[in-house]
Amino acid sequence: MRPVHRGPAPAGGFANYRDAATPLMTALGDYCSYCERQIPTHMAVEHIQPKSSVPALLTSWTNFLLACGNCNSCKGHVPIALADYLWPDTDNTIRAFEYKLGGLIEPAPGIGPLVLLKAQATMRLLGLDKYPGNPDPARRPTDADLRWQHRRQLWDFAEKAKARLLANDSIQLREQIIDSAVLRGSFGIWFTVLGFDADMRQRLINGFCGTSTTCFNAAATPIPRPGGVI
């Protein structure tokens, strides 16, 4: 899950929270802040604290992220305790989750018991642990939830790009791969598959607008986020 920085609130604020959609997409790109899919239309302005339970934050810039319909629906409107979860705008979430062959997501190894609980809770909250064949029937996706399929397809696509890079490395090819990644989304998958190459890691960080640069060191390696739990 890509760590993001939305930047300062636009001058004048918002009379209607839906008006924040365009500024958010300008700041963060047209990607779901949770599953990372590129969503060209109908992106929801996501309230981190549900608007029904914390109406005071209805139009608060710092309470906004972007969400696809699947992540938004899974998260719902139930009151939550922010400290029980990990958030891409306050934590270095790229360190908390591991993307694996086939596009599966799991808590990253070695993150410690406290962060592990938060990572597991975050996956359950957003339904990121849902995939066909899950031993728990409640954690299998509906027919309308194709996030797992998108991750699998992007993993395969990224692996092909990696193979081309290893076979015929060039600046032009590196730029083309980043262009493809930015157009398709799923930062975490690209960062995992191309993570062996520091230059490509840095190009991904630079290419995906709104990526929090404080979450990476000079070698483009993920580091603890200042003020975050990871």
Report residues per predicted region.
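PEST-like low-complexity intrinsically disordered regions enriched in Ser/Thr/Pro and acidic residues
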Residues: 76, 80-86, 91-96, 100-129, ...
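Histidine-centered nuclease catalytic patch
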Residues: 13-14, 34-67, 75-97
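Alpha-helix initiation and capping sites
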Residues: 58-65, 91, 113, 141, ...
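C-terminal, charged low-complexity interaction regions
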Residues: 123-230
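Generic recognition of cysteine residues
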Residues: 32-35, 74, 209, 215
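A generic structural signal for short, solvent-exposed coil/turn residues
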Residues: 24, 37-40, 89-91, 97, ...
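Short, charged surface segments at domain edges that flank catalytic/cofactor-binding sites
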Residues: 1-31, 54-62, 158-159, 163, ...
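Phosphate-binding glycine-rich loops of NTP-binding sites
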Residues: 70
